[in-house]
A protein has these predicted regions:
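Aromatic- and glycine-enriched beta-alpha-beta binding-site module
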Residues: 105, 117-174
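Metallocofactor- and cofactor-centric catalytic cores in central/energy metabolism, strongly enriched
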Residues: 2-136, 177-289
Length: 289
């Protein structure tokens, strides 16, 4: 396999889906193949409709037990759906051919809690002691929302979903702690009630919203300035609806400061073979680690 260890700043143009063959992202395997081959490194919203997508956290083994406990203690923002064997990039429970070194469109590399670079391939950084964690993602429930007749604004606008750090604190486990990060989609109050009922059936994709309405109530000062992603329009009669977000572990890693960890870049997810409604939590609050 050709090593694509290049900075994303050198990848101008391959975030554009228009130049790819029709139907390339209709299946998980097709989406991953485009990413793995270097033909695409953009956001994954709307890809392989009906299938699960995952956030990524890769850590040295010495840090893995505490992070597993952190997921158990915080299942809403950190719903664990897949985990590798030590040193293996494979996640067979989510897809037979998944390779965590190449199959995420864009990775973030963190050293001692600092973001040092973004890459579209981490093969050169892979270590024999790495453990990979895949966490459920809100992009997994967007197809379910659309099938009920609810539009997803950031998809319609061709943007990455807006994400915000909040004043809601996660439960600390070992060195991992910090604020919950949330994603936002605007709906009317009636639509929000429908969205909540739909998403409550999908706990492996963050479940029901954690907050609806006033952003200031959860510590968001300016809804027009997300911490990650892109701002999206909120129309007259709509309220912001907030879900737990799998970028939360990145905030926790900034506090824990492991010597090296690798995550996905927000909005650039691992597309899985498992249907969104077939994803299962590997551990939940109260389970034994």
């Amino acid at each position: 396999m050709t090593d694509r260890n290049r900075s994303v700043e050198m990848e101008a143009g391959i975030h554009d889906r228009a130049g790819l063959a029709p139907g390339w992202a209709a299946t998980p395997a097709g989406a991953r193949a485009a990413v793995r081959s270097g033909r695409y490194n953009g956001n994954t919203s709307g890809m392989a409709p009906g299938h699960g997508q995952g956030n990524l956290m890769i850590l040295p083994k010495d840090w893995a037990e505490d992070f597993l406990g952190y997921c158990r203690a915080n299942p809403v923002p950190c719903p664990l759906i897949g985990m590798t064997e030590t040193g293996s990039p494979a996640v067979p429970m989510l897809g037979d051919d998944i390779d965590l070194r190449t199959d995420v469109p864009r990775y973030r590399v963190w050293r001692h809690g600092e973001l040092v670079e973004e890459r579209d391939d981490i093969s050169a950084l892979w270590q024999d002691d790495f453990v990979g964690f895949v966490l459920g993602c809100s992009l997994s429930f967007e197809d379910a929302l659309e099938r009920t007749g609810l539009r997803v604004r950031h998809v319609d606008e061709g943007k990455v979903v807006p994400m915000y750090r909040t004043s809601i604190q996660t439960t600390r486990v070992g060195p991992f702690h910090g604020p919950m990060v949330v994603s936002m989609r605007p709906y009317t109050p009636a639509e929000a009630a429908i969205a909540s009922a739909v998403c409550a059936q999908l706990p492996a994709a963050h479940g029901a919203p954690v907050h609806m309405g006033d952003p200031a109530a959860i510590g968001i000062a300016d809804i027009g300035c997300p911490d990650e992603g892109e701002p999206t329009a909120i129309l007259a009669g709509e309220i912001p609806v907030f879900w737990g977000c799998g970028v939360t572990p990145q905030a926790a890693a900034m506090m824990a400061r492991p010597p090296l960890c690798i995550t996905h870049a927000p909005g650039h997810m691992l597309v899985c073979d498992v249907p969104a409604n077939g994803l299962r939590l590997l551990c939940a609050q109260g389970d034994e680690v």
